Each structure stands twice: as C-alpha cells, then as structure tokens.
C-alpha cells in the first residue's frame, strides 16, 4: 500500500524527451523570443480584446496524450489565444493603470524563471535573499525614504526596518494588517479581536477590505470614511479624528489606517503627514499604499506627495504598474520587521539550519503569507541597472507630459470638462451636461437629478462606443456620484502621437453619440 508495483514500472514506455534539454531550450527559446518580438511590432493597432465569453471553447476539452511541437503550439497561440488577449502593452492602452513592460523586465523574468529557485529562506538560495535586500535599499534610497525603512549594515543602528518583495499590494496590506493585529492583541488580549477597527477612505482600494476580512476584523468595524470634491477626494484628517473618537467612545480599539497616494478611481492623494499626526495619538499602524503613484516619487518634483512617510509604519508601491517591471512585483518597506516576523513566521524542523539560528540572515518566508517565493529581485535589479535612475525618471516624466498634452486637448473642446485634478499621468474627464442638453439647463422646471443621471448614462455610452471600436481602450470610475472616463497614460510604447490619435477617436464617437441624444428629459 502506498507504493507502485515494480511490474507496472517495467511495463511503462520510456519517455524519449528530456524536459530540460539545453539544446531544445535554446532552439525553442529563440522561437519564443522571435514570436514575442514580432508581437510587439504588431501590437500597435488593437488594444481591448473583442472576444465574447466562451471564445476559448474551440480548444480541445482534454489534454493531449502525446507531445506536440512548439511550432504547432505557437501557431495555436497566434490563432486562438492572441484574439482573446487585451493588449496591455499596446500604445493605445489607456485603461485601469499601466502594466508597463520593458526589455529589462522581461529578461529579468526570464532569468528568474530559468534559475527557478525557491528562496523561502537564506539557505535555500543566498543570492536571491541578499539581492532582494540590496534592490529594496536601492529603490528606497531613490524614493528618499527615511533610514528607518531601510536595512542597515550598522549593528549599532538599532533599526529593524527593511524591504521585501511581495506579489501584490493585496499581499502587502494583508501582511502589515496581520502584524498590526497581533501586536495590538498581544496588548489587549486575543479575545478582543472583535473590537479592532480599520480605517480608510471611500476611495481606498478594495484590497484593504479583503485583507480585513481575511485577518478576522469584524466587517462592522471597517470604516470607509467619506471624501468629497472639496478635498479632491483625499481623506480629511479631521474626519478621521472624529471617526476615531466616536469608535473609542463606543468601546472599540483603533488599529490600522491605510492612506493612499494615487487612488485607483482618480489618483487622489491622502495627506500623509497630517493623517499620521492623528493616527499616532492612538497608536494606530499607518500603511501608505502608493501602488500606482509611488513610482513617480523617484522624481524630486513628485516626492512631496509622500512627505510625512517618516511617521508611517509601512509603505508600498507596485513596480509592475509604472516602473517597467513585469507582474508581479510589489515593493513593501516596514519600520518594524520584527512585528512581521512575529506574526508570520513558522519554524518546522525540516527548515531549521545554522544560518537561520545565527540571526545574521533574513528568511523572507517570515515576511509574507506563503512559504514559497519567486526570485523577483532579479527583474527589478535588471530594470534598475539597465536604465538607471536618470532614464527611469525621464520615462515617467514623458508619461506625465503626455497626460498634460491630453489635458490640453480636452480644454480646447468646450463639450468636455476635467472632473478631478490631473496629478500624475491619468486624466479623468466627461462630457458636460450642457453639451448633452444643448444649453437647456437654464430653463425653469429642470430636474437636475435626472440631468446628472442622463449625463452619466451618455458618458457611459461614449466609453463603450470608443472601446467597442478596438482603436483605444479606457475605463471609468464614479466619484461623488459623477461618472467619469479615465485616460491613464503609462504603456511603455505610447508616444504623444498615440495620445493625439486617441483624442480624435473620442471626438469622432462623441459626434456620433450626441447626434442621437434625446434631450426631452430637461422638459
């Protein structure tokens, strides 16, 4: 029982393939590189996939029993897979946030996958651990993060700060929330977990709510504090203070605040310094989520957006968004790594070793949720070395400049308006109500609620019409009840001419949409 009979082994046919044959790897690898290079030459036309649900049903229902050639497989990729791909690297991709690729990022990923190490602790692959610590310090220095967030070679520094590469912001937030939870429960008793409260704005990424659920926070104790146009949808410190005081009055325990630099809907920026001042009065762990906009803060002119970060407990950004590093690569820095380790560490006998026992190495398995971990630092290292700080800043500034160009094009068309300030490289705009209703808004008896509903509806139709054309791809958000179209510049291949072309496409579809509008709603 529990073993395979030897007669079965003897009767098995011997496979003639070696899954890791160096010569075949070289041959097939060249084919893949050529395939992808050709893909990038031709990705300049379409952006969003026009496939319908179930489009992959043409593929076989079962796996092949015998091997197939790489030539056949690549042909199927061309015919069956690519038509169902939304082309995130297209220069005409302006949706969500960018997933900016680069040659260095791709090649770094290739090296990482090629070595295929599992660097859960230092002993399992020393170079993977030590390179990660180095690149996290490099990037932290580029951001001008305080030394309390960086690794120190000075044994007398007394700092337990440092950085770790997570998969996504969701993981980074979950890790820091778990660390703060355990730190607090060790003080007040684990039986009081239902008293813990998590704070954010109504613009904070949904990753925080998911993390709170996983960490066992009572859903009733999740505070999404309302924002408004008056603060450009940033979180008000006074609103935070009032909410905290009300919770304390109710016998609850403030635990965790997630402040955002560059919200998903509108790239709003929470005031880090003032929020930290409020939070620190109550011992609240402050995490700064700069998933999108953090990359821009390597440029001195954007660094002020994270002023006050020295008072926060943790900080993260996604290098796979706007830093030319392939998915997944979330950079997390913490001041107190001991809190992470205490909350997340495990020490089974089969992982014990002298290096870990010496306390002179980092075991990154204790800084994350999973045990296994990828060699993510390799691709970030290649990006930093291949382009250098000066070029990376130049790339980012070019995207901001293109967004300002788009902003200027909108300003010249009186039918449109900018809904929220253009802070980084995303423009949020909409068709004005006046453009939709032909100047009838000043008439008596106008139902302004109906006007806003109709305006939102028309802007939604405009977006869907543009996206259905396949020429460009944008997405939307709703802030303060206003439906707006998001134009996010950041694809590596995008040039100013693509932005100008996108605007022409938008204008053409606007002309068509406005020609069919029924403005009887104002009557």
Curated annotation (Swiss-Prot):
Pfam families: Pyridoxal_deC (PF00282). It is an enzyme of class 4 (lyase). Residues 1-20, 47-66 are annotated as: Disordered. It catalyses: L-tyrosine + H(+) = tyramine + CO2; L-dopa + H(+) = dopamine + CO2; 5-hydroxy-L-tryptophan + H(+) = serotonin + CO2. Keywords: Decarboxylase, Lyase, Pyridoxal phosphate. Roots. Its cofactor is pyridoxal 5'-phosphate. The modification N6-(pyridoxal phosphate)lysine is found at residue 321. Belongs to the group II decarboxylase family. This is Tyrosine/DOPA decarboxylase 5.
């Amino acid at each position: 029982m529990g073993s395979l009979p030897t007669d079965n082994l003897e009767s098995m046919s011997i496979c003639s393939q070696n899954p890791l044959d160096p010569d075949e790897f070289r041959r097939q690898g060249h084919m893949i590189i050529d395939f992808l290079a050709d893909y990038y030459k031709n990705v300049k036309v379409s952006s969003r996939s026009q496939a319908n649900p179930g489009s992959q049903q043409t593929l076989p229902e079962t796996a092949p029993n015998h091997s197939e050639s790489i030539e056949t497989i690549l042909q199927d990729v061309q015919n069956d897979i690519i038509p169902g791909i939304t082309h995130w690297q297209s220069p005409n991709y302006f949706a969500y946030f960018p997933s900016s690729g680069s040659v260095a990022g791709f090649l770094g990923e290739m090296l990482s996958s090629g070595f295929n190490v599992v660097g859960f602790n230092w002993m399992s692959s020393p170079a993977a651990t030590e390179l990660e610590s180095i690149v996290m310090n490099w990037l932290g220095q580029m951001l001008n993060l305080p030394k309390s967030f960086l690794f120190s070679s000075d044994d007398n520094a007394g700092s337990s700060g440092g950085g770790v590469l997570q998969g996504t912001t969701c993981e980074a937030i979950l890790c820091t929330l778990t660390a703060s939870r355990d730190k607090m429960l060790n003080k007040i008793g684990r039986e009081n977990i239902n008293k813990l409260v998590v704070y954010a704005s109504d613009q904070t990424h949904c990753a925080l709510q998911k993390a709170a659920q996983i960490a066992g926070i009572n859903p009733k104790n999740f505070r999404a504090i309302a924002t408004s146009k008056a603060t450009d949808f940033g979180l008000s410190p006074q609103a935070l203070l009032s909410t905290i005081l009300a919770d304390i009055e109710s016998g609850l325990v403030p635990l965790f605040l997630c402040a955002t630099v560059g919200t998903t809907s509108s790239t709003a920026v929470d005031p880090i310094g003032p929020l930290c001042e409020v939070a620190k009065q109550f011992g609240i762990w402050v995490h700064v989520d700069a998933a999108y906009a953090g990359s821009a803060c390597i440029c001195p002119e954007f660094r002020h957006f994270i002023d006050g970060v020295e008072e926060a407990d943790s900080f993260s950004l996604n290098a796979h968004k706007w830093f030319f590093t392939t998915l997944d690569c979330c950079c997390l820095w913490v001041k107190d790594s001991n809190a992470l380790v205490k909350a997340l560490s495990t020490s089974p006998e089969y992982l014990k070793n002298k290096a870990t026992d010496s306390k002179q190495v980092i075991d990154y398995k204790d800084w994350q949720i999973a045990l296994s971990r990828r060699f993510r630092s390799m691709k970030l290292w290649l990006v930093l070395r291949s382009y250098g700080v000066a070029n990376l800043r130049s790339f980012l500034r070019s995207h901001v400049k293109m967004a300002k160009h788009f902003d200027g094009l909108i300003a010249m068309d009186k039918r449109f308006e900018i809904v929220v300030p253009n802070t980084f490289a995303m423009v949020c705009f909409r068709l004005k109500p006046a453009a939709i209703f032909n100047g009838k808004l000043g008439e008596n008896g106008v139902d302004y609620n109906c006007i806003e509903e109709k305006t939102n509806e028309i802007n939604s139709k405009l977006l869907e019409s543009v996206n259905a054309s396949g020429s460009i791809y944008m997405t939307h958000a709703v802030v303060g009840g206003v439906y707006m179209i998001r134009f996010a510049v950041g694809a590596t291949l995008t040039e100013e001419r693509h932005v100008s072309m996108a605007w022409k496409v938008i204008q053409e579809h606007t002309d068509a949409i406005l020609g069919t509008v029924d403005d009887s709603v104002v009557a």
